[in-house]
């Protein structure tokens, strides 16, 4: 059961994973994290669980996030397993299968120097000096892990007209052009989260 069904829902919730089933018989749940940064899931004092709506579903409304206190959580291979307050048997844990796990951004531990939470990189303008002076070439749409390091998926953009907004560059079929950039020191020169900007030396040739 939720710890507080009527608790005010934070406005800064970040989805960090999905519950993919029960773990054991004592009410523990197993979570598949969305990224390698699962330490936030393990350290957060509360999770907010939401049942999302499939993209093709019609007439279905997503459930409101409900808060569950985390009694304990630990890594289990590539997953995270956790005991939530009020969930005491396998049937209750299985009932949570498929729910999105969200955590308030305010609960994230402070990142170490030269380390960044992936969620903070999404939406940053991406610049490169590969052709000389730094130029904005796109925006970070997604961050994922390739097993060795993080990868930025950058949607390429055209330079905006005066007073306008950047627009995606597209191929002959109208699909947005993208590039994948290793998030490593050899190519990422600077990250300024306050300015929402990432500078690199990555070439933009496709």
From Swiss-Prot:
One of its GO terms (molecular function) is ribosome binding. The gene is rimM. It is found in: Cytoplasm. InterPro entries: PRC_barrel-like_sf, PRC_RimM, RimM, RimM_N, RimM_N_sf, Transl_B-barrel_sf. Binds ribosomal protein uS19. GO terms for biological process: ribosomal small subunit biogenesis; rRNA processing. The PRC barrel domain binds ribosomal protein uS19. Residues 113-206 form the PRC barrel domain. An accessory protein needed during the final step in the assembly of 30S ribosomal subunit, possibly for assembly of the head region. Essential for efficient processing of 16S rRNA. May be needed both before and after RbfA during the maturation of 16S rRNA. It has affinity for free ribosomal 30S subunits but not for 70S ribosomes. Disulfide bonds: none annotated. This is Ribosome maturation factor RimM. HAMAP family: Ribosome_mat_RimM. Keywords: Chaperone, Cytoplasm, Ribosome biogenesis, rRNA processing. Gene3D superfamilies: PRC-barrel domain, RimM. It holds the Pfam family RimM. Belongs to the RimM family. It comes from Bordetella petrii (strain ATCC BAA-461 / DSM 12804 / CCUG 43448). GO terms for cellular component: cytoplasm; ribosome.
